[in-house]
Design a protein with these regions (language model features):
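Non-transmembrane, juxtamembrane loop and terminal tail segments
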Residues: 1-39, 112-123, 269-306
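First transmembrane helix
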Residues: 21-36, 49-71, 92-100
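Membrane-interface transmembrane-helix boundary segments in multi-pass integral membrane proteins
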Residues: 44-48, 219-257, 276-281
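Transmembrane alpha-helices of multi-pass eukaryotic membrane proteins
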Residues: 45-60, 78-99, 128-144, 163-177, ...
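Helical transmembrane-bundle signal
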Residues: 56-67, 92-99, 141-151, 181-184, ...
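Membrane-lumen (extracellular) interface motif
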Residues: 63-87, 151-170, 185-199, 214-236
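Transmembrane-helix exit/juxtamembrane "anchor" motif
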Residues: 100-109, 251-275
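Alpha-helical transmembrane segments of multipass membrane proteins
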Residues: 204-215, 248-256
Length: 306
C-alpha cells in the first residue's frame, strides 16, 4: 500500500531532496522551475523588474526608519514592534528586498546564460529558506489588505488628515502597503499562494493576540482599541472582532489565490511567460536526434544505391 500523503515542503511547492546520481525529471527536483518568483508578465526585462522591487523596498525602509525615529523621539520606541501594522510593514520591506535581490541575481545570470539560468534561492539555498520565502510571500499579499481594511473600517477617520505628517503616515502605512501587495499579486508571475499557508497565516494572526496582550501587561495599553475586552473597548464584541478578522483572512486568501490563477492563465494565453532554456535544450536534443536518424537513413539509402 503506497503512502500518498505529501510532506509540508511538497505542499509548499518545494521538491524533495534528490541524490546526485538519482535520475529524475529536471522540473520535479527544482524549486520554482519556471522562475515565477523572479519574473513578470509585464516587465519582461528582469533588471527593470528587480530594480522596481528594490525601489519599493528602499521606500518602505526609509519610511520605517523615519517613523521609528518619531516613535523614539516621543518616548514610544519600545512599543513600535507591538503594532501589527508595523510588523506587516517590516515584512513587506523584507520581502521586497529579498525578492529584489533574487531578481537582480537572476537578471545577471539571464544576461550571461539565457532565461533558464536560475537564481540563488532556487538553485543553492536550503529548502528551509525556500519554504520561508513561500510563507513570507503568502503574508505579503494578504496581511496588508487586512491592515488597510481594519484600519479604515475601525480606527481611521478625519483626524488622520489633520497634519502633513499624519497624512503621509496614513498613506504610506495604510494605503501604499495594500497597493504594493496588489502590485506583487498582479504584476508578477509568482504562483498562487499554496493552500497549506492559509492555516499558517491564521496561526500568525492568532499569535499576534499574544503580542497585543503582553504589551498591555508590560506597557499598560492596548495597541488597538477593539482588543480591549472592557466596556470602554469592544467589550462583548471582542470575540466577534477576532473571529471576523480570521474569517476575513480566509476569504481574502481565497480571493488572492484565484486572482493569481486567473493572472497565470492570462499570462500563458498572451505568451507572457518565459520559455526556459531547459525546454529549449530538450527541443534541440530531440531535433538533433531526429536529424541524426535522418542522416543515418540517407547514408543507408545511399549505400544501397551504390
Amino acid at each position: 500500500m503506497t503512502n500518498n500523503r505529501k510532506s509540508f515542503y511538497a505542499l509548499l511547492g518545494i521538491p524533495p531532496k534528490h541524490k546526485l546520481d538519482e535520475k529524475s525529471d529536471w522540473a520535479s527536483r527544482t524549486f520554482d522551475p519556471e522562475h515565477k518568483y523572479v519574473t513578470s508578465p509585464i516587465f519582461r526585462n528582469p533588471f527593470i523588474f528587480g530594480g522596481l522591487r528594490i525601489i519599493v523596498a528602499l521606500y518602505i525602509l526609509i519610511t520605517t526608519i523615519i517613523f521609528l525615529e518619531e516613535y523614539v523621539s516621543q518616548g514610544n520606541g519600545d512599543s513600535y514592534l507591538s503594532y501589527f501594522t508595523n510588523l506587516t510593514y517590516i515584512g513587506l520591506c523584507a520581502y521586497f528586498f529579498a525578492s529584489g535581490v533574487q531578481t537582480i541575481c537572476y537578471a545577471l545570470r539571464w544576461r550571461r546564460n539565457g532565461a533558464g539560468a536560475g537564481y540563488p534561492l532556487q538553485q543553492s539555498w536550503p529548502r528551509f529558506l525556500q519554504g520561508l520565502h513561500v510563507i513570507l510571500y503568502s503574508t505579503v499579499i494578504t496581511f496588508p489588505f487586512i491592515v488597510t481594511i481594519v484600519y479604515w473600517a475601525l480606527l481611521g477617520g478625519p483626524h488622520v488628515w489633520e497634519t502633513t505628517w499624519s497624512s503621509w503616515n496614513a498613506v504610506s502605512v495604510h494605503i501604499l502597503n495594500a497597493f504594493f501587495a496588489a502590485c506583487e499579486l498582479v504584476f508578477t508571475n509568482s504562483p498562487p499562494v499554496p493552500w497549506i499557508t492559509l492555516p499558517v497565516t491564521i496561526l500568525l494572526l492568532g499569535s499576534y493576540l499574544g503580542v497585543a496582550y503582553i504589551t498591555y501587561e508590560t506597557q499598560g495599553f492596548y495597541t488597538y482599541s477593539f482588543l480591549d475586552p472592557s466596556e470602554d473597548g469592544s467589550g462583548k464584541l471582542l470575540p466577534a472582532y477576532v473571529i471576523g478578522i480570521a474569517v476575513g483572512q480566509c476569504i481574502l486568501f481565497t480571493v488572492v489565490h484565484f486572482i493569481a490563477v486567473l493572472r497565470q492563465k492570462l499570462a500563458a494565453k498572451y505568451k507572457r511567460v518565459i520559455v526556459l532554456d531547459e525546454g529549449r535544450k530538450a527541443k534541440r536534443r530531440k531535433g538533433k536526434a531526429r536529424g541524426g536518424k535522418a542522416k543515418a537513413k540517407d547514408a543507408e539509402e545511399g549505400g544501397g544505391r551504390g
